[in-house]
Amino acid sequence: MKAIIGKKVGMSQIFDENGHVIPVTVIEAGPCTVVQKKTSEKEGYNAVQLGYEDVAEKKLTKGEMGHLNKAGVSPKKHLREFDLDNAAELNIGDIVKADTFQAGDFVDITGISKGHGYQGVIKRWGAQRTPTSHGGGPVPRHAGSMGSSTDPSRIFKGKIGAGHMGVDQVTVQNLSVVKVDPELNMLVVCGAVPGPKGGLVTIKSTVKVHKVKQAGADISKNPQKASGRNPQKASARNK
């Protein structure tokens, strides 16, 4: 697995070779410093801890500064642990840059979604408005009755309701890397990324294999049709 920490810069759009508009997100990826290296002999598993974004020493706790001073690394604001493929090759103090990814790679990006404050059931969960006529009630955007009467005489757990919306950890999978700029430490990915501008994101190799249809593959057969499942029965039925 390949991984890096970064910040969302914003969204833009590009044109492909066919003239189609593609929405993209620009991410400032790295540089990240290797702060700690974990091994199966000592910790029981192999992993690498990366630090991102320099910060003033006074903004960190003594425990955090002791951890960073032990590694001989300047104060870092964000620390994340990853199970990298080249963990054995990395040493404490090494720099991981945006060029760890290449154009055409597929990645999973995790961030904190935008906060929307206190919202009702319509915006928060996509609930339907109540009827505005025939006794629909005084407030069309309020939730209707959920507790019934004597039985069950309560609201089941997990029912939708008004409340705080956003500021949740969200992962978007299978985004393709369109462009990599090692000099500016920039990644350009196709699609939207959770979070506001300047929000922290982690970029990792996708956990799901992105299947691409091979050229010349026979896509005319529909497995849902009888002819696709059993051609002999279909031919006998058509006689």
List the model feature ranges, each with a label.
Residues 1-239:
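Extended basic (Lys/Arg/His-rich) segments that typically form rRNA-contacting surfaces
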